[in-house]
C-alpha cells in the first residue's frame, strides 16, 4: 500500500477557532515538504504526563487537533532511520514518557473524507496495520512554556529537522532528502 498522492490542504481546513490551522514547509533541491496541522493551546490544562494529563504517557497522540496531522513530501526522505517514499502521510506520536516515537502512517482517508485524529471514544485513529513505521524523537524540556502547538521544518542542504514544541516539551527528529 502506498500513500495517496497530492492531498489538498483546503480539504483539511475546518475553520476551527479553538485549534486554528497551521502549516510549516521547507523546499530542498526544488522539492517541497510540508506539514499541515491544527494547533491546540494549553489553556491551563496539563497536556502530557501522568493519568490526569490530556495525553497521558503510553498513549498515541495525533500531533495536533481536529484532522490527523498530514505530511506531504515531493521527495523520498529518511526520517531518522525510517525510509519514507515521496507522497502523503498522517503523523502521530507514541508518547512513552520521556521518549516519544514519531509514527508515519499511510492512511489518509476514511471513506470519502480525510481521517479525523481521534475516534468518538477519544482513542487515536492511528492504525498500526497501516503504519509505514516508527522512529525515535529527541526529547528536551522547553526553555519556557509553549502555549500553542508549533511544528516546524528546517533544512540546510539535504539535511533537515522537524521540531514539535508544546507545553513544556520539545521533540525533534532529523531527516535527509534523498
Spans of features found by a protein language model:
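N-terminal export/membrane-targeting signals
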Residues: 1-5
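Mid-length scaffold segments of soluble, non-membrane domains
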Residues: 61-116
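Primarily secretory-pathway and cell-envelope proteins
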Residues: 6-56, 108-178
Amino acid at each position: 500500500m502506498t500513500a495517496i498522492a497530492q492531498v489538498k490542504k483546503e480539504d483539511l481546513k475546518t475553520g476551527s477557532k479553538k485549534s486554528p490551522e497551521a502549516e510549516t514547509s521547507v523546499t530542498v533541491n526544488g522539492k517541497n515538504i510540508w506539514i499541515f496541522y491544527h494547533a491546540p493551546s494549553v489553556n491551563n490544562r496539563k497536556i502530557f504526563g501522568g493519568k490526569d494529563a490530556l495525553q497521558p504517557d503510553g498513549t498515541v497522540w495525533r500531533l495536533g487537533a481536529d484532522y490527523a496531522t498530514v505530511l506531504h513530501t515531493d521527495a523520498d526522505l529518511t526520517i531518522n532511520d525510517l525510509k519514507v517514499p515521496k507522497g502523503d502521510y498522517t503523523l502521530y506520536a507514541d508518547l512513552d514518557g520521556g521518549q516519544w516515537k514519531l509514527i508515519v502512517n499511510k492512511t489518509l482517508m476514511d471513506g470519502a473524507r480525510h481521517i479525523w485524529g481521534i475516534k468518538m471514544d477519544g482513542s487515536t485513529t492511528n492504525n498500526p496495520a497501516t503504519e509505514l513505521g516508527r522512529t525515535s524523537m529527541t526529547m528536551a524540556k522547553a526553555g519556557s512554556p509553549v502555549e500553542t502547538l508549533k511544528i516546524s521544518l528546517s533544512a540546510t542542504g539535504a539535511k533537515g529537522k522537524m521540531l514539535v514544541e508544546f507545553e513544556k516539551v520539545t521533540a525533534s527528529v532529523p531527516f535527509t532528502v534523498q
